Structure formats: structure tokens, C-alpha cells
Amino acid sequence: MQMEVTLNSSRKKIREITGYTFEDEKQSTESWVTRAQSFKAAATVLSQSDISEVQYAYFYNAAISLELILKAVALFKGKGIPKTHKLQDLARTLDLPFSIEQLDTLELLSEIIIWSGRYPVPNKDSHWDNYHDVVQNKHIIRDGNITRACPKRFPTLENVSNIWDICYREVGGKSA
């Protein structure tokens, strides 16, 4: 047992020497951006799939990529890592140049992170009602019997990428 404790202590010392500690990674904008890029790449692949069953996986990966890149911006601006999944609120605190439509997209993606991307129903029926009566209605257009997505608000890959690029430029990256 003593040898195992010593070995773990040695591993921790190596991480400290190489700068790969919990605190270093937590405060590394680059780490947050890299993880955001990974989820964005997954969302891109899923968006190109012909398999309709992957839609929630696409939305979830797109939403998580935006949450991570927004938190990278917060860290870059010296605001720490906010403990929230409310992307619209996070974006507003960062003073990023988002349009009303983009903020609405972030609102929908927040619901996807919190529940609809992972579960068929939320923990509270009030979340269900808010999603279907308020949030989702901003993203659809009804014309008689026809319902379609609002092109400027729906989280298509193009809309998600435009939001992502605003954040990425904020941390010193160049648009993809």
C-alpha cells in the first residue's frame, strides 16, 4: 500500500513539473478551446449523416461545443468558468456581438444541454411547458398546415458555426 501511495505521489509530482495539473488545465483557455473543437467536429460529422436518429446527438454536441467555447471566452476575459448551462445568459455577460436570432439559438441549445438532448422529458413539467410553449416556438414558422424551421434561429450547422466563430475569434483564433 505504501508503495502505491509513493507511486501516485510521484505521478502527481511529474504532472506538477510538466504543468499538467488540475488547476493548470482548469485555467487553460487552450484546453477549453480544444475540447470545444472536439465536440464541434463531432457535431459537424453528425450533421452530415443521412441517419435521422442522430439529430439529438448532433444538437447535443453542437450545444456542448458552444458551452465550452463560451466558457473559454469567459476564462480568456478573466471571468473564470461560470457554472451554468444557460448559454444565452453566458453570452450576454461576455458582451459578444450576437444577434437576437443567435441569442435565441443559444436559448434553445441551453434546453438541449439541460435535458432535451439527453432525455425524453425534463425533471420538471414546467421545463417541458416552457420548452414547447416558449423556446421551441421561436424556432419554427407555422404557415397554415405547414411547419418549418426558422432559418435564422434554428441550430443548423451554419448557424452554430457562425456563433462558434464569433467566440473563437474572441480568444484569438481565426475563423474556420
Can you say where each PLM-predicted feature lies in the sequence?
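Short amphipathic alpha-helical heptad-repeat segments
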Residues: 31-39
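Membrane-helix exit/interface motif
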Residues: 44-47, 72-77
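A structural signal for well-ordered alpha-helices, especially hydrophobic packing surfaces
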Residues: 40, 47, 69, 164, ...
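Short, hydrophobic, well-ordered secondary-structure elements
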Residues: 37, 54-75
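Hydrophobic alpha-helical segments of membrane proteins, primarily the transmembrane helices
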Residues: 28, 32, 58-61
